[in-house]
């Protein structure tokens, strides 16, 4: 299940369904209600017996982009806010399609091709601009794409898992590709870390730092420990050659880190922690600023080590300006409880909320910022082991669950009144999409103008 921002406070979500792993796309309003008559639209009717990961992104005009595999081909499909297909293109032949939107509005896709990664750029009308695409490779090594995020000036950064032998060490390399297809960093990419190895089959995601660079987090083996790294827009690492460990000790196992960039500009990372050869699990976090750990050498306890069935899926999130950690607290193999803890700046827990404690299993937690200082959380699960229904919830900055408070219809600038300033915003978006699409039909038009005028503040 993937998420992307939609216009007017909405969110796009995509998911796989059916016996052939069909790809579907849905748009939800701020209260979580489907905005399309059919609820979801079919992106691709597939007849696959297995599938790989895929990507979802959106642009400033509210259009959605889904990149996925169709047998041996990688496809990129674009939909408008009303759920209509804008275009669909074949990106190339390979596996594991991923997508992002650059600062200039172009959509970028990357995928694994043989032992290398290929990258392509598309304009708003679906025209590929880089010929056969840009190849990211290294002689004698495999270079498999893990994620793609925007950089600056229309460029993107692509992270790749690099290794020379199947059982050998697996590290991360980062490549920057400019809008004209040039690669200003090392031809074989810049190493995110050089010491240690990723877990086999782990392809960690990363996030843009807002300044043309990126933050990375991952966990290494022998010992199982989490690390973070920052690379600037020039490709220079900021946290040493191999990053900074989340703690100064390695007596317990730390895996599956998740990170978010706080409103204060600091990096927050959360992970699952386990005492080896035991049933002792915990959820911990660390804050980084100025290349240093801020929550002590051992990090902060979100949920202290204790004897339970398991504690997993530590997932970083934002509720307004605050940072939260969602996680799974499991008392048994057939019962998972999703919790959310809001963290204070000093690493203490401000509040803790039960998100979902109903009977059944819950896994694959994902989180994205919501509207009105809230956050959205989604997961898979169901009443029985192996169930894979999709669920979502919204949590507010005060820890309460549910839809955001009802605002003033037509108050586009959030000043509490509907007046000429809001009318100006609506007219500037006329014919397109955006926050002035008050009825959620994908276009700012006369129907939205009527709603705004009906709410005009006397």
Predicted regions and their residues:
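Cellulosome-associated attachment modules in secreted, modular CAZymes
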Residues: 400-458
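Extracellular, repeat-based ectodomains that mediate carbohydrate processing or recognition
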Residues: 1-405
């Amino acid at each position: 299940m993937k998420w992307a921002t939609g216009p007017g406070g909405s969110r796009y979500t995509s998911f796989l369904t059916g016996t052939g792993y069909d790809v579907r796309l849905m748009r939800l309003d701020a209260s979580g209600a489907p905005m399309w008559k059919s609820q979801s639209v079919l992106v691709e009717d597939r007849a696959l017996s297995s599938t790989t990961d895929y990507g979802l992104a959106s642009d400033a005009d509210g259009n959605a982009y889904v990149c996925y595999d169709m047998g041996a081909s990688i496809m990129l499909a674009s939909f408008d806010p009303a759920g209509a297909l804008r275009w669909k293109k074949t990106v190339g032949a390979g596996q594991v399609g991923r997508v992002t939107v650059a600062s200039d509005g172009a959509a970028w896709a990357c995928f694994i091709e043989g032992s290398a990664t290929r990258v392509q750029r598309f304009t708003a009308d679906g025209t590929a601009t880089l010929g056969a695409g840009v190849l990211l490779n290294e002689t004698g090594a495999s270079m498999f794409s893990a994620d793609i995020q925007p950089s600056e000036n229309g460029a993107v950064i692509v992270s790749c898992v690099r290794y020379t032998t199947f059982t050998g060490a697996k590290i991360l390399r980062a490549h920057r590709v400019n809008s004209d297809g040039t690669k200003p960093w090392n031809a074989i990419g810049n190493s995110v870390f050089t010491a240690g190895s990723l877990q086999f089959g782990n392809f960690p995601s990363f996030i843009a730092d807002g300044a043309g660079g990126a933050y990375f987090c991952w966990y290494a083996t022998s010992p199982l420990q989490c690390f973070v790294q920052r690379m600037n827009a020039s490709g220079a690492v900021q946290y040493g050659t191999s990053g900074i460990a989340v703690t100064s000790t390695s007596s317990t196992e730390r895996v599956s880190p998740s990170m978010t960039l706080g409103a204060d500009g600091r990096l927050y990372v959360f992970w699952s922690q386990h005492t080896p050869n035991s049933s002792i699990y915990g959820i911990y976090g660390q804050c980084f600023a100025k290349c240093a750990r801020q929550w002590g050498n051992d990090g902060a306890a979100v949920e202290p080590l204790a004897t339970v069935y398991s504690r997993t899926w530590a997932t970083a999130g934002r509720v307004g300006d605050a940072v939260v950690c969602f996680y799974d607290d499991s008392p048994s193999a057939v019962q998972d409880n999703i919790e959310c803890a809001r963290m204070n700046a000093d690493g203490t827990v401000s509040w803790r909320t039960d998100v979902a404690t109903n009977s059944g299993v819950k896994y694959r937690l994902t989180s994205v910022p919501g509207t009105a200082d809230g956050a959205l959380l989604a997961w898979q699960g169901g009443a029985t082991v192996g169930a894979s229904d999709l669920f979502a919830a919204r949590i507010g900055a005060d820890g309460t669950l549910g839809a955001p408070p009802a605002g003033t219809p037509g108050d586009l600038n959030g000043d509490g009144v509907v007046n000429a300033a809001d009318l100006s915003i609506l007219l500037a978006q006329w014919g397109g999409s955006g926050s002035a699409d008050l009825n959620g039909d994908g276009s700012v038009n006369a129907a939205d103008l009527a709603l705004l005028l009906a709410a005009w503040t006397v």
